[in-house]
Amino acid sequence: MTETTAVVLAAGKGTRMKSELPKVLFPVLGRAMIHWVLDALQSAGIRQIIVVVGYRAELVRQELSGRGVDFAVQSEQLGTGHAVQMCKPLLEKGDNPVLVVAGDSPMIQASSVRELIEEFKAGSFDCLLGTLIKDNPFGLGR
């Protein structure tokens, strides 16, 4: 099995934010939130990262210039599954595992990413889903 590829979903508008700025570009501690996600993935040892862009793609591309990521374009926002499908041409090079994460999850930790990848590689899985157990899940999973 080859190295893990990460797909970062960053095509959405972030309608609830009531702004023209793509949600992944909102600042968190002085940086666009997507940088925290990319930092965690790269710290976990992931070398190939595909960022799916759509809404105001040029702003996201500009923000991420120099980060060494590849881009896939989701011209029409038709959901998460469709966004991942847009990566197919970049993923057909092998049978390596693919980790799909949201670009608006700045709290993701490299240790969690590493553990998920290790669990996947140790088992015989077609799919492995990382989840979170919360004492109070109110507001999650809209």
Predicted regions and their residues:
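Conserved beta-strand scaffold positions in the cores of enzyme catalytic domains, especially
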Residues: 25, 71, 127-129
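Conserved donor-nucleotide/metal-binding helix-loop-beta segment in metal-dependent transferases, i.e.
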Residues: 111-139
